Amino acid sequence: MSARAIDGNALSRHLRHEVAQRAATLREHGITPGLAVILVGENPASQVYVRNKVKACHDSGLHSVLEHYPAAMTEAELLARVQALNADPAIHGILVQLPLPPHIDAHRVIETIAPHKDVDGFHVASAGALMVGQPGFKPCTPYGCMKMLESIGYDPKGKHAVVIGRSNIVGKPMAMLLLQANATVTVCHSATPDLALHTRQADIVVAAVGKRKVLTADMVKPGAVVIDVGMNRDDHGKLCGDVDYAGVAKVAGWITPVPGGVGPMTITMLLMNTLESAERLVG
């Protein structure tokens, strides 16, 4: 068996075209969806991520504002900027790029973002809405993973899904979204004694721990759908995921590549959340 790849780049292009069309409709009502991105410090990776987000907004017809501050910015100053953006009617989504400098409490900053502008889906109000199945912003990476399943016509209902990782950003919300889709969900993590025992029974495996080759071919049920959220570097400095792609692709039914899988979907779902925030203004 040779797995079929779920092309995140192609799906992302399709969804961004939809975002652009819906944004054009909003502009006819005098509303341009607006995203504010705040970057504090000079983290090189964060600078790349932020540039990609701003470019994606521009390419899809969304308004974006990038506010880049020095690492010496105080927490009080950052909170004041977030509060000002909360009150700005031209801004429908606010994203504070993580990580923040160590003297700034990231949790406090995120909780200061107005829930109706929390397009990253990290606010406790968003997490609570997800938990109880109420409308709210879904964290972008898990949201993108669900869109990938949808794109191949895969219904998680009645399937056994294993999520490897329990972060607030990916693992936990991923498990909740799969539960909402009526999958039976197992969450595995660093204290799980026999990971393979669980993954071999899974129809869907989502790997999201940031560790190379955490999932190998002998750990995968034939025909399973494998979603690789990991972003790592191999011994040659080449981008790779959490999954041993070459081996697992011989066993799985579907698999997401790295790069070109989940990565582009994360930014696309950020655009989608920002668009949906603006659409709420026109009903």
From Swiss-Prot:
Pathway annotation from the record: One-carbon metabolism; tetrahydrofolate interconversion
MF term (GO), any: methylenetetrahydrofolate dehydrogenase (NADP+) activity
Gene Ontology CC, one term: cytosol
EC number: 1.5.1.5, 3.5.4.9
InterPro entries: Aminoacid_DH-like_N_sf, NAD(P)-bd_dom_sf, THF_DH/CycHdrlase, THF_DH/CycHdrlase_cat_dom, THF_DH/CycHdrlase_CS, THF_DH/CycHdrlase_NAD-bd_dom
Binding positions (NADP(+)): 165-167, 190
Function: Catalyzes the oxidation of 5,10-methylenetetrahydrofolate to 5,10-methenyltetrahydrofolate and then the hydrolysis of 5,10-methenyltetrahydrofolate to 10-formyltetrahydrofolate.
HAMAP family for the chain: THF_DHG_CYH
Oligomeric and partner information: Homodimer.
UniProt family annotation: Belongs to the tetrahydrofolate dehydrogenase/cyclohydrolase family.
Protein's recorded name: Bifunctional protein FolD
Phylogenetic placement of the source organism: Bacteria, Pseudomonadati, Pseudomonadota, Betaproteobacteria, Burkholderiales
Gene: folD
